[in-house]
């Protein structure tokens, strides 16, 4: 709307004549109309069409810019050895190589065909080799490989011009970035991921450096080596031969892939160990930790100095008193040692004197057997007689004749043998008394009121080992455990359990072995496998699984089983087969059975402890 003019302002009015309307027909033309028709036919937006136009124009510009490079050795190539030729060089794309587009490859092939086709050369008067032996076959093979994305990818993976070398640690120490940056840039072409981090420079932060090395330590490579397969499965005459060729090729590819990943890992390791930024970050972190450590150490040192000053006087007094006691004890021990040495030398001298005297008299016999027997008796005297007895015997031998000496020696031998016999009888009587008391104790059960069967004794031993010293309310827990698992029906109190445990500790080792042997014999009797009758008319089945091992588990086997259970979690395929392999001498069935037993033991242990805990809470 126009603003109305004021009173003092002048108003101008312009009038003119308009020509009459004329109807005419216009046809749309031009590149804009053509673009509109394309968008309408393809049902796309204008922005999408602009992107495609830019892409086509960029490809056309690239196609216009590249120039084919003539391969001078093209005519000398052997068509039969086409697999070892450089396909990019054959098509004149030696400089572009893996960067060449499909349009460029097609254009290069077209140009090579126009120039080297046998018909063209024959028309020009050139001598042509008939069949597939002409070098033009190499051009056809090169285009066949490079036009197929899968085959081209395989050839690019073993590009003969690619430099697989990596810098050593010593090369990277002098000029790290110049040595490693082009190598990482060169090897980044094998990555499946597009956003590849750069090596950076000395100003890169620790997050960027960590991200770079994390990417390369987890490098995902698409490089594969199927082009180097020595055997072609298409040449196989039968299915078995084709499978064998495929197996050999897969093994060779896996080995080359492994070597490639080792090469990449070595590159990253060399770079990481030579990277000056890593060294700088480590030094900074070390300095920070040392500063914190020093501050804490200073605080602790000041606190300790005060305590040390207070304890120093007490420690000094204790030290002096201890040194005095040690010196007195040392002097006393030295005196005792000297006395023992003197006595030992005297006994040794008297023993040797006795042996010499008896030897001079040929051990009082001309019979060799009697001499040997007397020699044994003389050695027994040397071992049993005290110093005074040896001296007395030697003095009597020195002043007596052979017969008198023999009588003196035989008398001494008789006394020693009689003493040995008395000691043996006393020991046998003591052992018999101990055995009798242990049997009465085992029958009475310690408390004298409740009998203990062999099953209850074994259950008690198992419970004592299951709940070691230090367990909260240990004997109450053991009593509850026995009451839950005993088949005798007798209820045991903590006092009964303690008395019986003490009586078992006093048993002779031989009696303990007898009890364990009886328990094991009973176990074998209860778990004896009854052989099944086999019908001769029916073929017997073959079971591949090994029989369960009924022998008890050793401590070493138990440790191996526990380690295997940690190593192979529940979601591991074929878990129990792997666990059985980790425990030598045990089958899968043995391991599963032992695991169930351990689970039941743990559940029983928890149940017994919870019962005692609940009873304690109720009393409170």
From Swiss-Prot:
Residues 447-509, 548-603 form the SANT domain. It is found in: Nucleus; Cytoplasm, Cytosol. Component of ribosome-associated complex (RAC). The keyword Transcription regulation applies. Its main location: nucleus. This is DnaJ homolog subfamily C member 2. Residues 86-159 form the J domain. The gene is dnajc2.
């Amino acid at each position: 709307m126009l603003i109305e003019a004021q009173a003092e302002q002048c108003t101008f009015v312009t009038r003119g004549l308009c020509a009459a309307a004329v109807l005419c027909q216009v046809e749309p033309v031009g590149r804009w109309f053509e673009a509109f028709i394309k968008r309408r036919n393809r049902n796309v937006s204008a922005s999408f069409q602009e992107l495609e136009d830019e892409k086509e124009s960029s490809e056309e510009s690239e196609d216009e810019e590249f120039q084919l490079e003539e391969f001078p050795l093209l005519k000398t190539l052997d068509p039969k050895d086409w697999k070892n030729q450089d396909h990019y060089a054959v098509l004149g794309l030696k400089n572009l190589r893996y960067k060449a587009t499909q349009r460029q490859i097609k254009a290069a092939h077209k140009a090579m065909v126009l120039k080297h086709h046998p018909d063209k050369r024959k028309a020009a008067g050139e001598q042509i080799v008939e069949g597939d032996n002409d070098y033009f076959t190499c051009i056809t093979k090169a285009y066949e490989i490079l036009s197929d994305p899968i085959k081209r990818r395989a050839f690019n993976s073993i590009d003969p011009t690619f430099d697989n070398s990596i810098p050593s640690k010593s090369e990277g120490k002098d000029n790290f970035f110049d040595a490693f940056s082009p190598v990482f840039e060169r090897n980044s072409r094998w990555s499946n991921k597009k956003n590849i981090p750069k090596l950076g420079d000395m100003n890169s932060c620790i997050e960027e450096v960590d991200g770079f090395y994390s990417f390369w330590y987890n490098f995902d490579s698409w490089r594969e080596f199927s082009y180097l397969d020595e055997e072609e499965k298409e040449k196989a005459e039968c299915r078995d031969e084709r499978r064998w060729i495929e197996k050999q090729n897969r093994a060779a590819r896996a080995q080359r892939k492994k070597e490639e990943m080792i090469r990449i890992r070595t590159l990253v390791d060399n770079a990481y160990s030579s990277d000056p930024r890593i060294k700088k970050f480590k030094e900074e972190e070390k300095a920070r930790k040392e500063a914190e450590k020093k501050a804490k150490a200073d605080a602790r040192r000041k606190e300790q100095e005060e305590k040390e000053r207070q304890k120093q006087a007490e420690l000094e007094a204790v030290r002096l008193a201890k040194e005095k006691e040690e010196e007195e004890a040392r002097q006393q021990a030295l005196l005792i040692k000297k006395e023992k040495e003197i006595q030992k030398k005297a006994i040794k001298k008297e023993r040797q004197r006795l042996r010499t005297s008896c030897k001079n008299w040929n051990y009082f016999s001309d019979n060799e057997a009697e001499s040997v027997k007397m020699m044994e008796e003389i050695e027994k005297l040397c071992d049993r007689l005290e110093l005074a007895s040896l001296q007395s015997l030697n003095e009597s031998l020195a002043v007596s004749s052979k017969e008198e000496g023999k009588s003196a020696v035989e008398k001494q031998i008789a006394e020693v043998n009689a003493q040995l016999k008395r000691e043996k009888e006393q020991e046998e009587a003591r052992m018999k008394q101990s055995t009798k008391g242990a049997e009465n104790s085992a029958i009475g059960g310690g408390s004298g009121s409740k009998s203990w069967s062999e099953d209850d004794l074994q259950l008690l031993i198992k419970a004592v080992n299951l709940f070691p010293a230090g367990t909260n309310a240990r004997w109450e827990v053991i009593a509850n455990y026995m009451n839950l698992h005993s088949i005798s029906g007798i209820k045991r109190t903590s006092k009964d359990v303690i008395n019986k445990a003490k009586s078992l500790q006093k048993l002779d080792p031989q009696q303990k072995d007898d009890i364990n042997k009886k328990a094991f014999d009973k176990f074998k009797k209860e778990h004896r496998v009854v052989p099944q009758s086999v019908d001769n008319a029916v073929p017997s089945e073959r079971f591949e699984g090994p029989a369960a091992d009924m022998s008890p588990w050793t401590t070493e086997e138990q440790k191996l089983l526990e380690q295997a259970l940690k190593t192979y979690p529940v979601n591991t395929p074929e878990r129990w087969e792997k666990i059985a392999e980790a425990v030598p001498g045990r089958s899968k069935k043995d391991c599963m059975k032992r695991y169930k037993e351990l689970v039941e033991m743990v559940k029983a242990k928890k149940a017994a402890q919870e019962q005692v805990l609940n009873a304690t809470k109720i009393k409170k």
